[in-house]
């Protein structure tokens, strides 16, 4: 997100001097580089939401940008199926939302579905086809955008692994090595750390990160089941997760990933096992999740029952078999791909935030809930953020 804002600031000649600060020695180590790579078509979002406003236009812009540079892209589309018959009516809702947002969709029968994915199952005999969904390699997108920004001149990238302090009233950052940086305007696009950065400016104090980990499995190369398109279930639209789905990569010989899980992460960078656990945060978020379960706001209890334990292989396999019943455990292997969703919790409303959230601060703008489809819509969202 930060790179796209930098790109648009230069493209629109708003500034000629930009400093990008990252805590890692290489960009894309966290949210952006670990994105699924799916360029979403805009089917899931209410028309009045920011996500709906920018998804379709943003997807077209990013897709064109990728194609112009010859970067890998798999224009494979997406098909959505109801795993249970009573979910068929949700296909109509998704189609309505998609069309309202400018997306192209069409209903398929079982014959059309099986022509593309012979092993797929629809509980109602219908499916929803989205031809404009595509898949890219997100880290390559990040690296190419970084390269082009640096080639333009006027852009420097600073690694601040040891941390920094801010003096908002003086528009000054003080780094651990003793150096300082003054700025005219600061854009906080820190992803998993964005709430912490915002709080240093006195912004968004009623929000905190509630991270959810997305683990993936993948189909073994010798498996005869190899979907050529994205295969998604009809989601529970009351919670911000799309359910376990199949996604072919943008490689020359696509790898098909299955996931992600949507299990609580016990740290902002708790990608594997006990790695980077934050005990205080984990305890606070566990208590928060328990309260959400008891209150059952927005169907949260259903999320817990259906998705919170998908990190357990038998449960993930069961969820995947709702889409492809012939799938077996021996067809799967653990993928190296894992990400953490930068999900915000609103302590005032006691709910998960379900839309982008950009808040102003002193000489600063804070992008606090860059959830999906932020990667898809990144260029269009960058313009929206710049325009305030």
Predicted segments with their positions:
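Flavin-dependent oxidoreductases
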Residues: 4, 169-277
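Glycine-rich FAD pyrophosphate-binding loop
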Residues: 10-34
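Dinucleotide-binding Rossmann-like beta1-alpha1 core, especially the glycine-rich loop
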Residues: 37-112, 116, 124-125, 243-245, ...
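Short beta-strand to alpha-helix junction loop
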Residues: 46-57, 81-91, 128-147, 305-315, ...
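Helix-loop-beta segment of a Rossmann-like dinucleotide-binding subdomain
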Residues: 72-82, 94, 101, 107, ...
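Flavin (FAD/FMN) cofactor-binding core of flavoprotein oxidoreductases
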Residues: 111-114, 135, 208-214, 218, ...
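Helical element adjacent to the flavin cofactor pocket in flavoenzyme catalytic cores
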Residues: 127-185, 189-196, 377-387
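C-terminal segments that line or cap access tunnels to active or ligand-binding sites in enzymes
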Residues: 251-329, 333, 371, 378, ...
């Amino acid at each position: 997100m930060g790179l796209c804002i930098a790109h648009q600031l230069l493209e629109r000649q708003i500034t000629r001097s930009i400093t990008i600060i990252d805590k890692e020695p290489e960009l894309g180590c966290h949210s952006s580089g670990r994105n699924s790579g799916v360029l979403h078509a805009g089917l899931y979002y209410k028309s009045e939401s920011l996500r709906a406003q920018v998804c379709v236009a943003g997807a077209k812009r990013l897709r064109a940008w990728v194609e112009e540079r010859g970067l890998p892209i798999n224009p494979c589309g997406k098909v959505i199926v109801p795993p249970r018959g009573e979910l068929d009516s949700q296909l109509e809702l998704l189609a309505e939302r998609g069309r309202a947002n400018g997306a192209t969709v069409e209903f398929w029968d079982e014959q059309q579905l099986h022509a593309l994915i012979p092993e797929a199952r629809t509980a109602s005999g219908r499916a929803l086809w989205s031809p404009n969904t595509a898949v890219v390699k997100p880290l390559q997108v990040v690296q190419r955008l970084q390269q082009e920004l640096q080639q333009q001149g006027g852009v420097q990238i600073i690694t601040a692994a040891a941390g920094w302090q801010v003096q908002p009233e003086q528009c000054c950052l003080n780094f651990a090595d003793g150096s300082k940086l003054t700025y005219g305007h600061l854009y906080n696009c820190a992803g998993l750390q964005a709430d912490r950065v915002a709080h240093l400016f006195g912004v968004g104090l009623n929000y905190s990160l509630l991270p959810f980990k997305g683990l993936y499995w993948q189909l073994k190369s010798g498996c005869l089941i190899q979907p050529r398109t994205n295969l998604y279930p009809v989601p529970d639209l009351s919670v911000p997760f799309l359910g376990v789905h199949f996604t072919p990569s943008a490689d020359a010989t696509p790898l098909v990933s299955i996931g992600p899980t949507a299990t609580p992460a016990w740290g902002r960078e708790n990608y594997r096992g006990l790695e980077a656990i934050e005990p205080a945060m984990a305890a606070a978020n566990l208590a928060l999740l328990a309260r959400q379960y008891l209150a059952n706001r927005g169907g949260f209890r259903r999320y817990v029952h259906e998705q919170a334990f998908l990190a357990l292989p038998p449960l993930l396999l069961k969820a995947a078999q709702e889409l492809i019943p012939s799938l077996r455990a021996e067809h799967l292997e653990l993928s190296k791909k894992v990400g953490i969703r930068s999900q915000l919790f609103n302590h005032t409303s006691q709910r998960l935030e379900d839309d982008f959230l950009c808040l102003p601060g002193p000489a600063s703008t804070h992008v606090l809930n860059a959830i999906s489809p932020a990667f898809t819509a990144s260029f269009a969202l960058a313009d929206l953020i710049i325009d305030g």
